[in-house]
Amino acid sequence: MRLSQMLFVTLREDPAEAEIPSHKLLLRAGYIRRVGSGIYAYLPLMWRVLQKVSQIVREEMDAAGAQECLLPQIQPAELWQESGRWDTYTQAEGIMFALQDRQDRELGLGPTHEEVITAVARDMIRSYRQLPLNLYQIQTKFRDEIRPRFGLMRGREFIMKDAYSFSTDEADLKIIYSKMHDAYCNILQRSGLAYRAVDADSGAIGGSGSQEFMVLAEAGEDEVLYTDDGKYAANVEKAVSRPADAQPSSFKSVEKKETPKTDTIAKLCDCLQCSPTQVVKTVLYEAVYDNGQTLLALVSLRGDQSVNEVKLQNELVQLGDVVKGKALIALTVAEGGTKWASQPLPLGYIAPDLADSYIQKSKQVHGKFVRLVDQTAVDLKNFVTGANEVGIHQVGVNWKTDIPLPKHVVDIRTAQVGDRAVHDPKQTLQTARGIEIGHIFQLGTKYSQALGATYTNEAGKEQPLVMGCYGVGVSRLAQAAVEQSYDKDGIVWPVAIAPYHAIIIIPNGKDSDQVEAAEKLYSELNAAGIETLLDDRTERAGVKFKDADLIGIPYRIVTGRSLKEGNVEMVERATHDAHQIALDQVLPTLKEYLAKAIST
């Protein structure tokens, strides 16, 4: 392609809207253009990158035995209501674009396709002889992000590969899940990216287990905790660990102490001259479900630990039967002046045994607190906790003898850097930032049971299909590659997904020898399958060099002064290494470089 004929506009300054390097560079280099909040046009260079990523994904999915299809983007609300996710996606998380057609039928623009593919399977799969089956598509998805940011990282529409597998049982599902894990590793390796596969929370998708594939980058929105031995890695939302041991308590008997103005752990410990590890703090949460009912949760954990609200949400979803709720719409920490309280709450001084009488009778609010406690608090003896009176704490408290142990003992703490690993206490958790590129789930029968998707087994008995789902953000992967690989001059594309392999620059368009040599190389390289740009614009040489660095093409060939000796300059973008090479050696040299770069 000739740059003089391409839609190609670069910017010298960073756009004000862009926050992270990859977003700035993709805008500056003319890869994308903002059309609206979280909505971007993929320009010619970007589209070539996306096509290459898609092809790698397609090849690996096909190699793993998956079959490509294409599902509708507009989805009937009825399918989502059958699965119980319509309210979650349109109200709780609110990420689905919902609309009505001219016949007042409710529809949604697909953020994901579990319901649609399950409905297709329900209609078409009858027998175990048709299984296992794995279907995938590469398609634009839509999500109504409240605060779109970071360009293609968190947009309102994006390109995604999503696959859905159907099996006869869990053992069969795990075989496909393992194949998808390996396929995702291959996709990221072939794309030239450094990554980690980590244990993850399943979120609104659900299922019994999942893993995320994180491209490592400082600007990543996710925190990954891992051990140096390579045996553990997890998203902080899912991570488990062993915290440091609690310090022995200096309190030997139960006693109330005045602790004025100590509504934080730091103030309390300063007042009582104790360690946060000797404190049991209790946080009061309000959980609102899809049926409008509110459940009040008292959450107790060790004073030096923090609540992992993703883990807490999962626990509260399981407890939703108490109020006949299926999905959690909102989860907030209770504040003073709540309408449901029958009397002022002793916020900052709450104990795990706060009386249910604090809850005013109401049709919308469950009349009893649900009480959860983290194991870190269960292990404490002679601890400090609130006294349910403002300005008062209890010291020397023990479970069961002085205060009832909450019914639900769960893991609801946030694992932290420096914590000991569960699998080996000698290993401590390290941290890295990551960009989630892929997520694979073992769904089980969640959707097949909800939508009535069954098959007949060998014994002639009807059974629910056992499902898995597997997503890769194609457009997100492309931007993540930039976030992981750039320098002060611009983008440094991995060779496998670069829009072009090489760019030929004519420093002086008025020099017929330079033009002739460039034209000849351009024809030879493209004919040999080396995707090559020709910068034949009437711009100064300096502008051409800056643009070449900015757009990040792996190899730059300059038909400059060394032509007199029969040479051209070849520059590797990643290292800026430059050397002179004979004209007739450009093609074999580039072939060698590309083969090596793509194979590693």
Swiss-Prot record:
Q: Name one GO biological process term.
A: prolyl-tRNA aminoacylation
The UniProt keyword set, sorted, is: Aminoacyl-tRNA synthetase, ATP-binding, Cytoplasm, Ligase, Nucleotide-binding, Protein biosynthesis
Q: Where does this chain mainly localize?
A: cytoplasm
According to its UniProt record, the EC number is: 6.1.1.15
Its Gene Ontology cellular component terms are:
cytosol
Instruction: Provide the family line.
Output: Belongs to the class-II aminoacyl-tRNA synthetase family. ProS type 1 subfamily.
Domain-related comment: Consists of three domains: the N-terminal catalytic domain, the editing domain and the C-terminal anticodon-binding domain.
- PANTHER family, per database record: MITOCHONDRIAL RIBOSOME PROTEIN L39/PROLYL-TRNA LIGASE FAMILY MEMBER (PTHR42753), PROLINE--TRNA LIGASE (PTHR42753:SF2)
Q: What is the protein name for this chain?
A: Proline--tRNA ligase
Q: Which organism is it from?
A: Acaryochloris marina (strain MBIC 11017)
This protein's encoding gene: proS
